[in-house]
């Protein structure tokens, strides 16, 4: 049963203070909940917006007492525990990989949230955030080759880290050459960007993706392909490309307008997220032999209104994928310790028998 009077738990913060909210009576939330709905919560007696992206991830009114207790216990023990891990080439990485999108300001929701993410994640905060991830047992980061991505990796190495780095890249005209990516970051793998993959396959230019994979291998690192369309992952596997890993989006968000009209008779506003998408992608993930990293398991925050939702998404993700697969999850821990919570869910549901 969900508790209606659980006080907000004080959680560790990254550098910088959370924005001040309006001081309210935690026992009289009715006018505020009526005004703002479930996107707000009380933190230390203050009224604050609570997004994962711009969506509610946790509220005192929606967490059960048992869940709060469990997360608190997990936070105390995580430094002594390791996360379940998988093999990617010669490297062992945690089944939970921290994602890039919040750091890069890719909110998949609103321009305002994108700006908030970019402004929040300064270089210092990114480094502190990644060190927090590593302390919770997360040993891999999927990043983009940008100034802040490169700077964070170089700073982490100066401070000392065992974290592995996986770069999402495409070597378009706007992108750095593959050699520079490797020289700058020492990444263990470079994965072809999923949005570009889907566009090239749709245009009949899938050979460009295959050539990218070969070129990455020529530079001596693992090569992967990301996609949102499960048919593209299946085709690559069926054709026997020399791919070391896949990144597989749980939602076919690049589904083109004409395909939506043909199959559904209607078109979603902005990105389409459909309930059946995870089943379709994970069915393909189970069929391919390579390790797969599933991403957008929370539908870019659309399934993160409560911790019960988040926990369910983690459980279902690990139930659907192979034991040799993992998940990539972006985190925005401004108001809630998402790192500790997500690590706890991975320990609970991602154990490999």
Give each language-model segment a name.
Residues 121-132, 173-182, 309-316:
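Short, acidic/polar
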Residues 56-67, 86-95, 126-128, 157-159, ...:
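Structured C-terminal cap/extension of enzyme domains
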Residues 146-156, 174, 198-211:
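Active-site-adjacent beta->alpha loops and helix N-cap segments on the catalytic face
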Residues 34-49, 54-75:
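N-terminal export signals
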Residues 184-188, 238-247, 289-290, 321-324:
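Glycine-enriched alpha-helix->loop->beta-strand junction motifs that scaffold or abut catalytic
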Residues 60, 64, 71, 75-101, ...:
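N-terminal amphipathic alpha-helix/helix-capping segment at the start of soluble metabolic enzymes
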Residues 1-50:
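N-terminal secretory signal peptides
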Residues 98, 223, 292:
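Conserved, mostly hydrophobic/aromatic
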């Amino acid at each position: 049963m969900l508790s209606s009077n659980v006080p907000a738990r004080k959680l560790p913060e990254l550098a910088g203070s959370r924005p001040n909210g309006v001081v309210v009576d935690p026992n009289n939330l009715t006018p505020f909940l009526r005004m703002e709905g479930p996107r707000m919560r009380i933190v230390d007696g203050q009224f604050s917006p609570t997004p994962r992206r711009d969506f509610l991830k946790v509220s005192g009114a929606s967490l059960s007492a048992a869940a709060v207790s469990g997360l608190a216990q997990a936070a105390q023990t995580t430094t002594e525990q390791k996360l379940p891990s998988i093999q990617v080439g010669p490297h062992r990485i945690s089944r939970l990989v921290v994602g890039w999108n919040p750091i890069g300001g890719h909110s998949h929701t609103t321009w305002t949230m994108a700006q908030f993410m970019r402004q929040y994640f300064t270089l210092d905060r990114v480094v502190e955030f990644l060190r927090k991830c590593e302390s919770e047992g997360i040993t891999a980061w999927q990043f983009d080759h940008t100034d802040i991505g490169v700077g964070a990796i170089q700073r982490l190495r100066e401070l000392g880290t065992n974290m592995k780095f996986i770069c999402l890249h495409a070597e378009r005209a706007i992108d750095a050459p593959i050699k520079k990516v490797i020289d700058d970051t020492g990444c263990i793998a470079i994965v072809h960007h999923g949005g570009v993959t889907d566009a090239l396959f749709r245009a009949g230019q899938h050979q460009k993706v295959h050539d990218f994979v070969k070129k990455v291998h020529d530079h001596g690192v693992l090569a992967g392909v990301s996609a949102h369309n499960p048919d593209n992952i299946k085709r690559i596997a069926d054709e026997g490309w020399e791919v070391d890993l896949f990144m597989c989006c749980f939602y076919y968000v690049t589904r083109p307008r004409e395909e939506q009209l043909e199959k559904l008779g209607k078109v979603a506003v902005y990105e389409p997220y459909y309930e059946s998408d995870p089943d379709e992608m994970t069915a393909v993930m189970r069929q391919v032999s390579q390790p797969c990293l599933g991403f957008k398991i929370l539908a870019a925050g659309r399934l993160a209104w409560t911790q019960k939702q988040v926990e369910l998404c983690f459980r279902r993700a690990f139930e659907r994928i192979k034991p040799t697969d993992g998940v990539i999850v972006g985190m925005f821990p401004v108001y809630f310790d998402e790192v500790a919570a997500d690590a706890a869910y991975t320990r609970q549901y991602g154990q490999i028998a």
